[in-house]
Curated annotation (Swiss-Prot):
Subunit structure: F-type ATPases have 2 components, CF(1) - the catalytic core - and CF(0) - the membrane proton channel. CF(1) has five subunits: alpha(3), beta(3), gamma(1), delta(1), epsilon(1). CF(0) has four main subunits: a, b, b' and c.
Localization terms from the record: Cellular chromatophore membrane
Protein name as annotated: ATP synthase protein I
Principal subcellular localization: membrane
Family, per entry: Belongs to the bacterial AtpI family.
Source organism: Rhodobacter capsulatus (Rhodopseudomonas capsulata)
Entry keyword set: CF(0), Hydrogen ion transport, Ion transport, Membrane, Transmembrane, Transmembrane helix, Transport
Function comment: A possible function for this protein is to guide the assembly of the membrane sector of the ATPase enzyme complex.
Length: 114
């Protein structure tokens, strides 16, 4: 090694090391961004599925409970299952619209940055 024990490190070697490290960091960041985008889309897909299923479940629960109270066995359950489905679809479509708006804003910001 070119440095003495307890001496200062060689500035040229440090600069070369920093340059190599920065190049390695740049090559590692590119795949990570693509993976983050895929994860974000998968998260949104699961969110939409959960919204739809929870709407159905809540509608079923309300309908079943009201049927048990009033003794109108399948009637209110069917009505509230369809209402829950409609509510779940409405919330799911709103989430899809928000995602579309966010992607449009990101695309517009990307074009302005270039």
């Amino acid at each position: 090694m070119s440095e003495e024990v307890g001496g200062e490190p060689d500035p040229e070697r440090l600069a070369a090391l920093e340059k190599r490290l920065s190049q390695l960091k740049k090559t590692e960041e590119a795949p990570k961004r693509a993976a983050d985008g895929d994860l974000r889309m998968a998260d949104m897909a699961w969110r939409m599925v959960i919204e739809l299923v929870s709407g159905l479940g809540i509608g079923f629960g309300i309908g079943y409970g009201l049927d048990a109270v009033f003794g109108t066995q399948p009637f209110l359950m069917l009505i509230f299952v369809f209402l829950g489905l409609a509510a779940g679809v409405k919330v799911m479509l709103r989430s899809a619209a928000d995602l579309t708006k966010a992607q449009a804003r990101a695309a517009a910001a990307g074009k302005e940055g270039k």
